[in-house]
A protein has these predicted regions:
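Protease-domain processing segments flanking chymotrypsin-fold serine proteases, especially trypsin-like
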Residues: 30-58
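Gly/Ser-enriched beta-turn/beta-hairpin loop segments
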Residues: 43-47, 104-108, 159-174, 228-233, ...
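Active-site region of chymotrypsin-like
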Residues: 47-54, 116-124, 150-215, 219, ...
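Conserved active-site neighborhood of the chymotrypsin/trypsin-like protease fold
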Residues: 52, 58-62, 67-150, 173, ...
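A structural signal for short beta-strand/turn segments enriched in small hydrophobics and glycine
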Residues: 72, 135-141, 194, 273, ...
Length: 334
């Protein structure tokens, strides 16, 4: 009986300790602050609307942007901001203001712009220090097809980043399950706390229409450009690669059975790879001595290098002939 009583006493004591720990967590200031800081969706919309704006070039609406500090620095997409002409921003809160380009990073389709200085701090969205994980809900403020301040919900569709080829180069981004019409490019993707976890850059489309997947630029790239405030030029081969299993069935029939590698596509005439002897539809058998079969792995390897470095490629024609080795001097992606 005494043993049973002792065990019950220990169990009651452990349960008491457990309750005290749980209560202390709920009463801890950091927990309370975090709980209070989580805005309603209505408040989140208002916060994002205050810090977002439309991009105008020569008076025409070309995309979206958003403020990322109180001094008037803001982010938008390079594929819109690069267009020549008078750059302005417009919103119900800001009115219509002139803006200037400070720096860009084509490897992330990203442009840092600056609004006119003023005494009153600008409303802005803080940029998260980490990516949102797979399945997490995210919220986009955009300007779809000339409509204003539209709030779009999505979910992060993969872990980590991937690379998509558009606007003439590979862009690093994160997939989001969401329908994002044209005009949303440059808009902020936010988490539930109102922190920027990405910037809308592109959509997965076919001639039949949107495929339900969007690409957002990772927050790390936005923070980096804001900190540097100067152009970032990643290394480029001035060509693209595609995976063998993604090719047309007739192409796959022409290549030797068991071939491993990547297919050369979008080879730029007079580009650095073309000058080194690379040809359209070549198969890249090895990269710096490694067999690489996935595009993401290839681009990550490339992005670890800097302009001026050499990349060693082992190539062959699609029918297995003309095997050769070339060295390509990497160019800056400007």
């Amino acid at each position: 009986t005494r043993i049973i009583e002792n065990r019950l006493f220990v169990m009651n004591l452990n349960f008491t300790y457990f309750l005290l720990i749980v209560m202390s967590l709920f009463l801890h200031p950091a927990f309370s602050e975090q709980k209070e800081a989580k805005p309603t969706l209505g408040k989140l919309y208002e916060k994002m609307a205050e810090a977002s704006f439309e991009i105008l070039i020569n008076g025409r609406l070309e995309g979206t942007g958003f403020l990322i500090d109180q001094d008037g620095h803001a982010a938008t997409v390079w594929h819109a901001a690069k267009r020549k002409g008078n750059l302005e921003v417009r919103s119900q809160i800001l009115g219509r203001l002139s803006a200037k380009i400070i720096a860009h990073d084509r490897g992330h389709d990203l442009t840092l712009i600056e609004l006119p200085s003023r005494d009153k701090p600008y409303p802005y969205l803080p940029v998260s220090k980490k990516n949102a994980g797979p399945g997490h809900p995210v919220y986009l403020m955009g300007t779809p097809i000339f409509r204003h301040q539209v709030f779009i919900t999505g979910h992060v569709a993969r872990k980590g980043t991937t690379f998509e080829y558009f606007d003439g180069n590979f862009v690093e981004g994160i997939h989001v399950a969401a329908l994002t019409p044209g005009g949303c490019s440059g808009g902020p993707w936010s988490n539930r706390m109102g922190e920027v976890v990405g910037m809308q850059a592109a959509s997965m489309t076919l001639p039949s229409g949107h495929q339900g997947i969007a690409t957002m630029i990772p927050p790390k790239a936005i923070r980096q450009l804001l900190e540097k405030k100067e152009n970032i030029f990643p290394a480029t081969l001035q060509m693209a690669v595609e995976e063998i299993w993604g090719q047309d069935g007739n192409y796959i029939k022409t290549i030797p059975q068991g071939t491993k590698g990547l297919v050369v596509r979008q080879l730029q005439k007079e580009g650095t790879a073309a000058k080194a002897g690379v040809k359209e539809w070549d198969i890249v058998l090895k990269v710096d001595g490694r067999i690489i079969e996935e595009t993401d792995t290839f681009i990550r390897h490339l992005r670890r290098k800097v302009p001026g470095d050499l990349l060693r490629l082992e190539l062959m024609s699609k029918d297995g002939s003309d095997k050769r080795k070339v060295k390509v001097k990497l160019s800056p992606l400007k």
